[in-house]
């Protein structure tokens, strides 16, 4: 009987608490006090630090902590054609607190384009060495599907997709394209995060 071996025996999700310097920089950017370039400089510095910490702890996988994101899942969806978002002050309750989320909805058919997350991955990949591999995390296709059929989005989604089957088909094709983009950029550890199970 053949033996199957995995790259390592433990793993972690890869989303880390944001350091204060990062939170301060994002707030300053939102308030117009610093430029996008200045924000990116801080983000890159903090990612470099968190990668160094993961290596120091002996992990064989490294992530960027999802430090570039505003939301763990929605930012990824914004990287496709046909998806728009705006901050309307709405949100969902999480641990008895209101988490303010950008409304994310369709304005056309879903199609892949050059996804910004692939560029984010390339920054992370430079830190790979003989002991570590860069991992990137994205929301699962089911998460994307769920976002587009929540009650607030259902009517808008139906303007572009008459059936769930058509919606699922386009999500699948778009994901295949973006996953190929990650592969071509050298990504060999792509994690799909799926929180839709809690809605079953």
Could you tell me what each predicted segment is?
Residues 1-200:
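Domain-level signal for soluble alpha/beta catalytic cores
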């Amino acid at each position: 009987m053949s033996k199957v071996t995995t790259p390592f025996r433990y793993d972690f999700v890869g989303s880390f608490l944001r350091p204060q310097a990062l939170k301060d920089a994002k707030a300053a950017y939102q308030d117009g006090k610093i430029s996008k370039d200045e924000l990116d400089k801080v983000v890159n510095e903090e990612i470099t630090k968190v990668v160094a910490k993961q290596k120091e702890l002996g992990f064989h996988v490294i992530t960027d902590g999802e430090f570039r994101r505003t939301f763990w899942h929605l930012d990824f969806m914004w990287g496709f054609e046909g998806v728009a978002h705006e901050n309307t002050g709405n949100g969902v309750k999480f641990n008895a607190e209101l988490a303010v989320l950008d409304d994310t909805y369709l304005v056309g058919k879903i199609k892949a384009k050059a996804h910004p997350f692939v560029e984010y991955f390339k920054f992370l990949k430079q830190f790979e060495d003989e002991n570590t591999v860069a991992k990137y995390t994205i929301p699962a296709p089911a998460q994307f599907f769920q976002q587009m059929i929540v009650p607030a989005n259902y009517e808008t989604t139906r303007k572009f997709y008459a059936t769930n089957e058509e919606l699922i088909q386009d999500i699948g094709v778009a994901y295949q394209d973006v996953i190929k983009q990650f592969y071509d950029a050298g990504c060999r550890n792509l994690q799909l995060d799926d929180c839709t199970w809690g809605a079953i």
